[in-house]
Amino acid sequence: MSKFNRIHLVVLDSVGIGAAPDADKFFNAGVADTDSDTLGHISETAGLSVPNMAKIGLGNISRPIPLKTVPTEDNPTGYVTKLEEVSLGKDTMTGHWEIMGLNITEPFDTFWNGFPEEILTKIEEFSGRKIIREANKPYSGTAVIDDFGSRQMETGELIVYTSADPVLQIAAHEDIIPVEELYKICEYARSITLERPALLGRIIARPYVGEPGNFTRTANRHDYAVSPFQDTVLNKLADAGVPTYAVGKINDIFNGSGITNDMGHNKSNSHGIDTLIKTLQLPEFTKGFSFTNLVDFDANFGHRRDPEGYRDCLHEFDNRLPEIIANMKEDDLLLITADHGNDPTYAGTDHTREYIPLLAYSASFTGNGLIPQGHFADISATVAENFGVDIAMIGESFLGHLK
């Protein structure tokens, strides 16, 4: 019998809580990630008021320096810890796959100097459109359309760019290159990037609208991922008849593998929270696992190095946390975590190698405190033990600590 009939995992994308022990092996603009600290630096430089997460115990997580504006709680309502990544990457897919029990020992390919001509030429020949070569490098998704959107509107060329992540992204103005055409081009790009020397985690369609000086990316983004190289705990659950619900880009990250119910993409964090609440309210969802990704922290504020915007985004989530809890049942478990860091005060524009926080809450708890510090995959091991399925590759359950 399950200890919790339903478990709800919410990933606050990029909300790291301090440099990981191996941060010296990861870089931003040539600067090692050793001093990165997403939550710590936001709290220090922008001020951070998240009373609802603090009540669960966010401020109690062990750190060299306490979060400046997040108090510790003498009697928190939940259990907390921080988790370390073992996989060789700090990208979204690696983080989520490890959370679900995989150890990624061979990282995907990244292209710090842009994609080789062979790939670009193949995309041009397939699409019948030229590619803007000047955009072919690691680029902020908003900056690249600011810099080349006008040219694309005039010429119909494709904007192909990358980041420090193993991704190929194609941006296209919806009035110039229809979304369905963009999707077909991205599907082709996916087909030619499935093995080395260009093994990419994701191809991302990045549609946008607007006029020069006022371009906005739309919710028609679509990710073309590769399926995990072996079963994750999502597959174990689905195979055992335990329903799995994906909110936001979770379905894309796992390429649908192990997802029994895709609740759709998020237009924003707020929309994602709305969708999560609707999922919690589904009459047929009496037992199972929901998995939500809220990406605005990362996409809108981390990569843009905007600590004030990031702070406000955290405030928005914290303000709505009571709504999520109000729609949970007494025997539900809520787990709040992240997938990597993205310190908005740091060098460069890319992810940072950090610990991730873990907050656990249930109305059924009679205790509180610290969970032993562990690794990302401990989350999936806990979910697996609760529902009576095997773990994937790695992970140690902390279910017994939740009382």
From Swiss-Prot:
Listed EC numbers: 5.4.2.7
Cofactor note: Binds 2 manganese ions.
Function: Isomerase that catalyzes the conversion of deoxy-ribose 1-phosphate (dRib-1-P) and ribose 1-phosphate (Rib-1-P) to deoxy-ribose 5-phosphate (dRib-5-P) and ribose 5-phosphate (Rib-5-P), respectively.
Main localization of the protein described in the UniProt heading: cytoplasm
PANTHER family according to UniProt: PHOSPHOPENTOMUTASE
Reactions the enzyme catalyzes: 2-deoxy-alpha-D-ribose 1-phosphate = 2-deoxy-D-ribose 5-phosphate; alpha-D-ribose 1-phosphate = D-ribose 5-phosphate
UniProt protein name: Phosphopentomutase
Record GO biological process: 2-deoxyribose 1-phosphate catabolic process; 5-phosphoribose 1-diphosphate biosynthetic process; metabolic compound salvage; nucleotide metabolic process
GO molecular function, one term: phosphopentomutase activity
Family the entry assigns: Belongs to the phosphopentomutase family.
Cellular location(s): Cytoplasm
Record-linked Pfam families: Metalloenzyme
Key words of the record: Cytoplasm, Isomerase, Manganese, Metal-binding
Pathway where it operates: Carbohydrate degradation; 2-deoxy-D-ribose 1-phosphate degradation; D-glyceraldehyde 3-phosphate and acetaldehyde from 2-deoxy-alpha-D-ribose 1-phosphate: step 1/2
An annotated GO cellular component: cytosol
Entry cofactors: Mn(2+)
Protein residues bound to Mn(2+) 2: D298, H303, H351
Binding site for Mn(2+) 1: D13, D339, H340
Organism name: Streptococcus pyogenes serotype M28 (strain MGAS6180)
